[in-house]
């Protein structure tokens, strides 16, 4: 079973990758807020496989830290039920 760390884990820099890898994670989905330059730096700083969103919804919060959906709609984005309140 492959383990992937999605944006909900808030792994936004390569220094956090070893923690996820120690848990058995093989792929990290980087936050969609990162620029291309930041993604390049991330890739250079880890040997983990990276996945990048290139199109789609951009949260008003930092990926993985949204509380808007829960506050406005009673649906937790951090549990996969984002209401796209933004």
Locations of regions flagged by a protein language model:
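Active-site pocket-lining/capping segments in soluble small-molecule metabolic enzymes
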Residues: 1-11, 29-30, 38-86
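Short, acidic/polar
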Residues: 11-18
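Acidic, glycine-enriched active-site microenvironments
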Residues: 24, 28
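Flexible loop residues that form catalytic
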Residues: 33
């Amino acid at each position: 079973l492959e383990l992937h760390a999605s944006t909900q884990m808030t792994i936004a820099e390569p220094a956090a990758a070893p923690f996820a890898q120690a848990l058995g994670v093989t792929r990290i989905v980087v936050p969609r807020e990162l620029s291309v330059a930041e993604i390049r730096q991330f890739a250079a700083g880890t040997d983990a496989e990276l996945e990048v969103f290139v199109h789609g919804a951009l949260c008003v919060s930092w990926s993985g830290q949204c509380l808007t959906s829960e506050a406005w709609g009673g649906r937790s984005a951090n549990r996969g039920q984002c209401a796209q309140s933004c």
